[in-house]
Amino acid sequence: MTNLRKELEKCKHPNSRKTKALGKKARRQNNKHKVRLGHAIKSNITGEKLSWFLGQIDEGRTEPLRPQELEDLIELYFTRFDEELEQINLKQSIGKHRANQHAARKDVITMTLEKERNEFRTGGLELMNLCDPLKLKMLRDWDGSALSVQHLKLDLVSYNMLQRLKEQSKKKETSEQMET
């Protein structure tokens, strides 16, 4: 970027072809940087989400989660900000006369939770299907870095998908009981 700035300073006329080409080159580099930054932010958010789920699963557990356990874990994930929201509400109740001090943080939390709940109920949260033994093993082997998140195969885990998995597991259990 500094080389571009130096070259722009050398240009004599602001409407010359060289000046326009350098401006175009600068905009292109800026746009590339924005795209890279967007990918980095997304992988950081996904990495934090996966590390939260990994931290909630028992260390010694080798068998995959049952669909009901995964649904309970997702519901627990939705309550991860409850303590912080309680603290904000407590601070607001103490000083009624002051302006809402933590309104921005509270709004971000509520919007995030609303978006995630809506995703879970409709299309699905971008997560690893922890009901699959191979994906659970991949999550266990993950080093926790945001750079390696892109190598993990993520699924869209939705409420409807978990209901289908529950029905399949019930059918499987009943067929096994019929055989014995």
Curated annotation (Swiss-Prot):
GO cellular component: nucleus
Family: Belongs to the TMA16 family.
Biased composition (Basic and acidic residues): 1-12
Top-level taxon of the source organism: Eukaryota
Amino acid composition bias (Basic residues), ranges on this chain: 13-32
A Pfam family matched in the record: Tma16
Ranges where the record places region Disordered: 1-32
PANTHER family: TRANSLATION MACHINERY-ASSOCIATED PROTEIN 16 (PTHR13349:SF2)
Protein name per the record: Translation machinery-associated protein 16 homolog
InterPro entries named in the record: Tma16, Tma16_sf
Transmembrane residue ranges: none
